[in-house]
């Protein structure tokens, strides 16, 4: 899955 927004991309 790709991150559409920073909230999805939690690293």
UniProtKB/Swiss-Prot annotation:
Keywords: Antimicrobial, Fungicide
GO biological process annotation, one example: defense response to fungus
Function: Has antifungal activity against C.tropicalis (MIC=32 ug/ml) including the inhibition of biofilm formation. Has virtually no hemolytic activity against mouse erythrocytes.
Descriptive protein name: Antifungal peptide 1
